[in-house]
Amino acid sequence: MTLALSLFVLFYILMLAVQQYRPWVALGGAGAFLLLGKLGVYDFTLADAARAVDFNVLLMMAGMMGTVFLFIQSKMPARLAEELIAHVPDVRWAVSVLALLAGFISAFVDNVATVLMVAPVGLAIARRLKRSPVPVLIAIAVSSNLQGAATLVGDTTSILLGGFAGMNFFDFFWMEGRPGIFWSVELGALASLGVLFWLFRDQRQPVHVTVETEVEDDVPTALLLLTVGLLIAASFLPEPSGGVLHLLYTLRSGLVCMGLCLFGAARACWRSRSLRPLAETFRALDYDTLLLLFSLFILLEGVSRAGVIDAAAQLFHSAAGDEPLHLYLLLVAASVGLSAFIDNIPYVAAMLPVVQGVAALMNGGAGIEPELFHFGLLTGATLGGNLTPIGASANIAAIGILRKNGETVRTRDFLRIGVPFTLAAVLVGAGSLWLFWGI
């Protein structure tokens, strides 16, 4: 086990150190464990690796990426932003509305894509009013990060949780007779919106915005809504007993997302009488993230086969004792702190089996249901990224946009918004989760 743990720590550090090559580092780690399996050090074969890969998650990710690209190209997000801003009285309300819009979109769309959609509107408003766009774009970024945990398709970490725990789209709203994580995220969002409103309390300059953007195609919006609807419907399908139907059942969410994406791209090709839209849609996919997830599935299965996951679960159980509240607080606090500085995708992927193992050790070894701890892990890992400028990809994207537009973003500018926003969201979100699931 020492060899496996050393290898995992080495490859994890390399993923943090060379961010631009992290998919290849993860793939190298997966290859290393497969080699050890081939040499007989661990019981880990190529067939085991293939079974470890959650192709449903990968298909969901790829399909949503493609549909979101078509949605952005239709200019519907910009139109929505202009329509909303045209009805607000001042800057304070404009920033709050943009943050709300970014959060709403991010519940169904990748966080970085959300920032790319909404940021141009924030920039335009700030320029018209001759104000710094820095706090506006920071507010948009942290709001998009928060809402990513609200639904199954809102963020990569949510999709990872859904795949690992066998959760469907509806489970994020209501699960086992209790409110799902969606409601805790929304309560946290209300608290953090109050923080934003307070931070911008002096920004009372009137806003005058005209609706200028023309939506080029309504179908991508319909496809996005249809994707959500079909994912909900797929949640209620009965599970077949076996064979090809069972295989299709295990891939149902991925097939829905990928099928609608391909339909949208094919329709765009038909409208333009060329294959260019299809090529652009496939170019828009985030292949680095897809390869990273593919590799992590194999790497973490190898780590698990070596006994590292069980040892980590024992360590967490020893630290928290047999008290669920202690474990919950430890998970949330550790996730918030670590995700402020490291990427939450490999962190969540690594911690999900650990959390499952700790839950099995609770209650004197009889085990308890892990849902509370899964939701706590996701909440902490998602919100922790808002503490620092480098804690989440959406933050980095927003800062990149600002720098391209000649703006200087100081760390204290980000912390002034990110820290109180995160504290409010974590306290209310994690607190409500405990009320729903822990008592």
Model-derived segments and their meaning:
Residues 80, 113-124, 137-138, 151-167, ...:
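Re-entrant/interfacial helical elements at transmembrane boundaries that shape
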Residues 91-104, 130-147, 172, 177, ...:
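Alpha-helical transmembrane segments of multi-pass membrane proteins
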Residues 124-134, 166, 170-180, 200-209, ...:
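Alpha-helical transmembrane bundle and helix-membrane interface signal
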Residues 1-72, 79, 175-314, 407-409, ...:
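Hydrophobic transmembrane alpha-helices of multi-pass small-molecule transporters
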Residues 148-149, 182-190, 337-344, 382-390, ...:
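Hydrophobic transmembrane alpha-helical segments of multi-pass transport and channel proteins
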Residues 47-134, 289-364:
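Membrane-embedded alpha-helical segments and adjacent helix-loop junctions characteristic
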Residues 167-171, 357-372, 435-439:
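Helix-coil boundary and interhelical linker segments in multi-pass alpha-helical membrane proteins
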